[in-house]
Amino acid sequence: MNEDPNTPILGLHLEGHYLSPKKAGAQLPDAIKNPDPAEYKPLIEDFPCIKRWDIAPELDGALELGEYLTSKGVLPSIAHTSAVYDDVVKGYEVGYRHVTHFYNAMSGFHNVREYKQEGTVESVYLIDGMTVEVIADGIHVPIPLLKLVYKIKGVEGTALCTDGLSCSAGDENMYLDPRFIIENGVCKLADRSALAGSVATMDRLIRTMVNEAGVTLFDA
C-alpha cells in the first residue's frame, strides 16, 4: 500500500460488521454478526494494510478478537455498541484503547426496568487511558457535549473526525442514492430514522470547535 511515495496511505480502517444489532445506525442490520476467527484471521494475515477495526466489545468473541488484533499491531476500537462499564473495562484490558464516533450509535445512561444503568459513554469517561474520536460538525454531537468531551478527555485524548461521505461539502440536491438524503447539513437515512454520515470537511470541524465549543485554535 505504501510502495508508491505519492500515495502514502497509512492503513485501512474497518467499520463493521462485528457490531451491536441494537446500535446499527446506518449499517446494514442483516450484515451484523458476532466475531468469527475463521473470517477475521485470514483477513488480518492477508491484508497487513488493516490498521484499525471497529467492534462492539460486548459481543461473544469480541474480547478474543481484540486480543488477537492487538497482537498483530491492529487497533481495536469501540463502536456501534451497547456496552456497559464491565464490557468497556474488559475491552480496555485486551486492547480496546480508542472509541470511534464517540456518542454516536452507542449506549449512554439508561433505565433497566426500575434500575439505572451506565452506558458506554460514561464508562469511557472513567478510563483515563481511553481516547475518543468525535464527529465535530455540531450535529452528530451537540455543542454542549463537545465541550464536555474536551473538558474531560482534553486535547491529547480527543480526535476530530469528519466521517465524511462522497457527498461531503455538497448541497441537498447532490446525493442521488435513494436510501439517503442530505438535510440541514448532514446525511440521513431517507426515513430519517438515523444519521448516515457527515457532509462536513475538516475546516468545518475546526470552526465548530473554536467558534462554538470554545476550544483554542491551537488545540483544535
Residue ranges and their predicted role:
Residues 20-21, 34, 108, 167, ...:
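Generic structural "secondary-structure junction" signal
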Residues 36, 40, 62, 202:
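Aromatic/hydrophobic pocket-lining residues that form the small-molecule binding cavity
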Residues 45-169:
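Active-site core of metal-dependent hydrolases
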Residues 40, 146, 206:
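Generic structural marker for isolated residues within well-ordered, non-membrane alpha-helices
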Residues 14, 69, 99, 209, ...:
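Conserved, mostly hydrophobic/aromatic
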Residues 116-134, 150-162, 168-220:
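His/Asp/Glu-enriched, well-ordered alpha-helical/loop segment
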Residues 1-49:
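Divalent-metal coordination cores built from histidine and acidic residues
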